[in-house]
Amino acid sequence: MWGNVAPPLVQSYDCSSFDDSPERHPPTVSQYHPDPDLDIIKKAYVYSAKVHQGQLRKSGEPYLVHPLEVAGILGELKLDEASIVTGLLHDTIEDTLATEEELTELFGSEVAHLVDGVTKLSKFSASASLSQEEKQAENFRKMIIAMAQDIRVILVKLADRTHNMRTLDHMSEEKQARIAQETLDIYAPLANRLGISWIKTELEDLSFRYVKPQEFFALQAKLNKRKKEREKYIEDTCDLIRSKLAERGLKGEVSGRFKHVYSIYKKIKSQGIDFDQIHDIIAFRIIAPTAPSCYEALGLVHEMWKPVPGRFKDFIAIPKPNMYQSLHTTIIGPLSERVEVQIRTSEMHKIAEEGIAAHWKYKEGKAVISKDDEKFAWLRQLMEWQQDLKDPKEFLETVKVDLFTDEVFVFTPKGDVRSLPRGATPVDFAYAIHSDVGNRCVGAKVNGKIVPLRYKMKNGDTVEVLTSPQQHPSKDWLTFVKTSRAQQRIRGFIKQQQREKSLQLGRELADRELKRFQLNFNRLLKSGEMKKAAVDLGFRVEDDMLVAIGYGKVTPQQLSHRLVPQEKLNAAEAGGRADANPAATTSGGAGNSVLPGLSRVTDLAKRLVGRSNRSGVQIGGVDDVLVRFGRCCNPVPGDPIAGFITRGRGVTVHTVGCEKALATDPERRVDVSWDVRGDFKRPVTLRVLTADRPGLLADITNTFSKKGVNISQANCRATGDDRAVNTFEVIISDLKQLTDLMRTIERLQGVYSVERI
């Protein structure tokens, strides 16, 4: 870019050369800002032109076009001059020789901080080792952290992505599909959560065009077929509403529009219908002067046309979490077709279009999110999740389920409103109130009637949770709860229960082992000797070590080896009273010792099979042992596992949390581990609860194919309530592949739950 010339050092730029022609003028904020600093915007324009000089975009246009367009979008959002300047400079640190120090000197620390924040969202410290999905997940985590620090960073990023999507034609098809899918998964839902509806709509339609081009252009062609006829219909209907408002002495601006392409596509897919069966592709909007006049206009509309029962929504009384307010009603319109009508005030319309930007833009200093502002409760929830969920992919999946799905609004018995993902159950509602309420939930009343815990709540339901001190979460709840909060709390409780059982089992095994050497377990515990042994085995406290013994990660012999005097160990070995010579363990408590009874199992296995097993599991480092897998839990490589000697059958392998395994005599437990040297596949059965719609089974099987997973058996049946239960036995390489597969299926439209059985 600069050739052999160094970039400009920190200096004063002469803004007199600023081009004032309309097509090159950077966005002005004069029309909406009471006292804008236009000089800094002009200065940023000149600087951006200088440092980007000679750079071209894929389209062949000068690179400067991009920052100008980004700044223009930020101007449409009516943001402050610092945001506009950031839009002009957002690529300077990443793509030129400009530095943060230079930007600080020229434009101040606020702008430099914003530009640096946008730059960091695009950088990965270990990009070479990350998959595209992992990059996307990590990038989203960064966005949430940046958003909590200064919301303008995300608004600039949204503007940047919007212009990039507008010019995506010049990318390769592979990049088009990847960028569009990411936009559909993350940026469009994020714009919706921030309340910026026009960006959300544009990003969805642009993404749809590149993710599913055939469907996009086919649907667009159908919409264009009767476009002029529909435009005339919109004009006539608007005139009719205006005249009726005037007759009543009501003021209001009336407009009509086509619903955007992607929203129509989603309705076709979710309802399993054809385009010809979609009757509400047109919507009308009335902008009234006050909230009370909105309800007056609603009454007039319902007098003119019959409302469709169950299709009225009052978002004025109960705003959406993204601050959206409006009255929604669906009526049987002039041509006997369904038509949606939205009624709101001009202030509500402004918030619907600008969203979060409408609430902070002229406040002094940083646009930092207030911890006390209820409008940002969802963002505070995101911050908590990103701290709790260390895996970026798990964090992203959590957000997609809990925050980026459609919502239902339900009431507590006191009249408080709770927003939950569509498909949420009373158990999700209980955990949304408090973890203790969820843990003790025994039932629920919806609108005064007892309902099953699996009941899917609807808009306007009043939900009362019934609790009992004796109740505790059931593993079965995981098959139907929707929210990640409920899933985490249920898993946490079950894990704690398993820990307590393993702790008790570990104490019994340790006590039994120490008694062989006439040692008292409790005395060693009180004396501190047990603590020393735990630390020596790589644990912080005694309980962690005992839990590991209960799980089978550490053997009782490894403990006795550290507590029993050597002469006693030698005597026991010489006398044949000790079954094994405990070996030294590695740090972390995962040993590789020869276990009690292993030689007998090995001899038995050799007689039975006479060769190495092909199970993918090692028994105490020995390969040639007959191994079976518990059908109750069907472990796959990657699952924590435990082995149990089964007379006449070698060793049976279970997952460590399997209830059958926990109930097995601990004396029969042996140390097992997955053999990482080979590629071993295991059958797993998945139960997928779905809507009963055409094409959904094909979507699921296509997912198996894309993930490289073979189906060995399948059983699909309709349940008679517009649902279907689909059971698949699939061949899985490891736990990571299984988890990824289940999460992908869960994201399919019409899938309610995916369960491993």
Curated annotation (Swiss-Prot):
Keywords on this record?
ATP-binding, GTP-binding, Kinase, Nucleotide-binding, Transferase
A Pfam family hit: TGS
Q: Give the residues annotated as coiled coil.
A: none
Question: According to its record, what are the GO cellular component terms?
Answer: plasma membrane
UniProt KW Kinase keyword: yes
Q: Which SUPFAM superfamilies match?
A: ACT-like, HD-domain/PDEase-like, Nucleotidyltransferase, TGS-like
Q: Give EC number(s), comma-separated.
A: 2.7.6.5
Q: Which ranges carry the HD domain?
A: 63-165
Domain TGS: residue ranges: 406-467
**What's the name of the protein?**
GTP pyrophosphokinase
Q: Please give the organism.
A: Myxococcus xanthus
